[in-house]
Amino acid sequence: MKRIHHFTVFVFCVLACAGAVAQNGTREINYEGLKIIFKKTPKEVVTASLFIKGGTANITEAQQGLEALSLSLALSGGTKTMDKDAFAAQADKLGTSFNATASKDYSRMTMTCLKDNWDKSWAMFADAILNPSLNENEYKVIRDQMVSAAKQQESNPDANLRKLASDQLFGGSDYAKVPNGIPSTLENLKIEDVKKYYAALLGKKKCFLVVVGNVEESSLLNNIKNTLAKLPVGTDPKKPTFKSVTEPTTNIKDRAIATNYILGTLNAPKYFTTDGPLFEFAMSILYDRYFVELRTKRSLSYAPAAFYSKNTIEQPTASLYISTIDPKQSLQVMTDIINDIKKNGFTEKEVKDKKKEYLTDYYMTNEASAFQAGQLGFCEASGNWRMFDEINNKIDLVKTPDLNKTFNKYMKTIDWTYLGKEDKVAKEDFKQLAPSDEKLPVSDLKKTKRQ
């Protein structure tokens, strides 16, 4: 399991004639109805991403994978003026890359290029978006690749565990749908479905553009003028339906596999709220405690994890994860660690040390233009792109008592999912957390010896 920190700096906003400017040079521009978030940097690599809001709210259950397939085909299947091979050859010559990704809340079409090749690369990017060939032969190739990838996901225990947990928590809502599709839905999609869907997808109300790199604003607007500015107004983006953890639940799925996989899911605050960044910070410290107690001291798992998942913007989650041959002891230790924090809180030292690590991570991960574009887009989809520049100030101001209060506020009911040997666990092994105001039992964490 991977942790990805998303960080954001305090912003002073002033109004300029074309849009709002942030202290760090990030600028919001409204150009003929299209929202543009432009961050000028000294980097010689430029990234442009067109975000489409809605995510899985845009598709039905039978259409799972349709948006991802449509965008991938548009960017890699050639255009009406340049076939796939010619398009790929030109991209290689320029050193330009194109890719499309889909998530539960939005999709993204991205181009990354060298500054010197900005104009030519933009022309290709805009041509692919506005005039894709949507060729049937290329469609079949991409669809088959996606079917193969979906089948591999089904056979991967970690991916299977996440799918089981998502179905259990979000079942029947938009967030239960798989953006990249499942084999049965992908195999039933036709080229006509793709053409019809793509023709109605893009519009200024639903889309926004993020550009990060060393290009002039005048060059950017000039390139947009005769391309994306021509997008139709379109329809308002749809808000996804979702569910929350409301009561203790345990789903045990029997599998004859060597290692047992466990995922606990809890409700978490939305990222753009006051509690969001604090809770993410707290979960990062919990991750460290899990690593020490579950891996270093007990060797119960190679990669235990605790993290704040923002993959579902309207209902983020806290995740408790472990793969282990001893699920009983692992479950006990996982909940003991949290109960210990709820009782005694985080220490001043670990909060101070984590601040340094967090901010170092921020500066290192934010060097790439593609990463910055992705995080600016995520923050905009979450409510406000300025959040991207607020994390430094918020983390610097974190006080241990506030962190403990935020952690206790959300560490309540756990939705457990288990994939492994059924005879290794019983329902009662899947513990729930003690209430925050309840006197907790003395932790036995220090007494348990390494196995």
Please give the residue ranges for each predicted region.
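Bacterial Sec-dependent N-terminal signal peptides
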Residues: 1-24
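Charge-rich, well-structured scaffold segments of protease-associated domains
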Residues: 2, 89-235, 298, 303-451
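N- or domain-start disorder-to-order transition segments that initiate the globular core
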Residues: 22-46
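Short, surface-exposed beta-strand/loop micro-motifs that present aromatic residues
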Residues: 27, 35-39, 196-199, 247-254, ...
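Short, solvent-exposed loop/turn elements at domain surfaces
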Residues: 37-38, 45-48, 57-60, 273, ...
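His/Glu-based metal-binding/catalytic segments typifying zinc-dependent metallopeptidases
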Residues: 42, 49-54, 236-289, 293, ...
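Short, solvent-exposed loop/turn segments at the edges of secondary structure
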Residues: 43-45, 104-106, 204, 246, ...
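M16/MPP (pitrilysin/insulinase) zinc-metallopeptidase core fold and M16-derived inactive scaffolds
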Residues: 49-112, 285-298
